[in-house]
Amino acid sequence: MKKLLTISFLLALTATTSFKGFSQAFKQGDKLLNAGIGLNSYYGNGLPIGASFEVGITEAISVGGQVDYNSGSYGGVGYNWGYTALYFGGRGSYHLNEVFKINNDKLDTYAGIGLGFQSFKWSDASFGAGSAYGSGVYFNYFVGGRYMFANSVGAFLELGSTGFSNVRAGVTLKF
């Protein structure tokens, strides 16, 4: 009986031990769509919304695009000022689980950079003024993580220069 228990224990241990080498939440060929909101707008008003899409081109690198939108207005006695901001561009990420030895198939950590165009327009209805001041080429950088609740649905959080805020959170869909 003792021999049977020992053999059963060893078989159970062998069956639950992973021989894959490294379990990972991100891999080559993954398609990731993030949709979220900015939690801290650079402009102090409005709620930045944005989306990014990336494709895994290697086991650790993804490339794709990003778009962000924000608008807001300020008003008071004698003035009414508003703005609209739009960002679109490319982005790339390096996925860090293997670097940091994170062996979790639900967690994906990454850092990345982006390059795009930012359009910023403001108007002052009180004085009939307006401008596109602040528009032009825009460089962004970020660190982030996503946790997959299921194979195709998760949540993400990014910190850094992430469009129009320095904190972005939302939903991730994996295809």
PLM region descriptions:
Residues F19-I57, T172-K174:
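Short glycine/proline- and aromatic-enriched beta-strand/turn motifs that initiate or cap beta-hairpins
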Residues G29-K31, N45-I49, G82-F88, L107, ...:
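Residues that define the transmembrane beta-barrel architecture of outer-membrane proteins
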Residues G21-D30, A60, N97-D108, F149-V153:
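Short loop/turn motifs that connect adjacent beta-strands in outer-membrane beta-barrel proteins
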Residues G29-Y42, V63-S71, L115, S152-T162:
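Transmembrane beta-strand segments that form the barrel wall of outer-membrane beta-barrel proteins
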Residues E54-F127, F175:
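Gram-negative (and chloroplast) outer-membrane scaffold detector with strong preference
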Residues A35-L39, A51-V55, G90-L96, I113-L115, ...:
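Residues on the lipid-exposed face of transmembrane beta-strands in outer-membrane beta-barrel proteins
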Residues A25, L39-S41, F53, G76-N80, ...:
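Outer-membrane beta-barrel proteins
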Residues M1-G29:
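Cleavable N-terminal export/targeting peptides
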